[in-house]
Amino acid sequence: MIVLQTIAVAFAMFSAIPVPQFDWNEKNMRYAMCAFPLIGVVIGAAWCVCGAMPLPGLAKVAGSALIPVWITGGIHLDGYADTCDALSSYGDREKKLEILKDPHCGAFAVIRLCSYFLAYFALCTCVSFTPRVGVLWVLALVLERALSGLAVASFPMAKNTGLAHTFATAADKTVVRRVLAVLAAVLCVGMAALGGWALVLAALVVLWRYHAVSWKQFGGITGDLAGWFLQKAELWMLAALCACQWGGLL
């Protein structure tokens, strides 16, 4: 029962998929970050179904670009937008953290979101769907969430409030780190074996960048920064997927 509650907590928080509602408590939040990567499986499966369907080209590309947003409800894009606003302010650390709390969407957030969707759509037009590509992309979507959860359990927090702090505080960090580190390692090996070593490299570079930016600019991570990382990792892995296909590796 606790396992199902843990999965439900992860899906309720990080997706728009209807799930049974439970009161969050110490037990069902302890390993919620371990269930977070399962959302990547759902998104990847929907992406594969879209890619395999006999749809017109533009409809298929639009579906591929929008499926992650529909399933997650845009929670990570919200963090991406807020972080883009904060970084574009060039203010001090306190100013940036204050912008992250502001519910309004600034001009730079709008510009970055438009640029993000344009780039994502363009990259989707370059992907030729095959079963191998589908499996690789499912693994990529799971990997980015495993790395995101690992960061929440490992990186310092920028503040003592917010979503990331809530999950980090409730988590059994030792177990979460071990589970997600092993999962990430297995995924990296599997992706490399499928010819997707460039996707692994892209994800790890973005993770390194995430740590560097969060520490230097904010003094640690927040829920918004976690969303920023996930969206950046997804875009760069998609670019790497296109590069692998162009290079004849897939």
Please provide the spans of the model-predicted regions.
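C-terminal ends of transmembrane helices
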Residues: 18-24, 75, 95, 149-159, ...
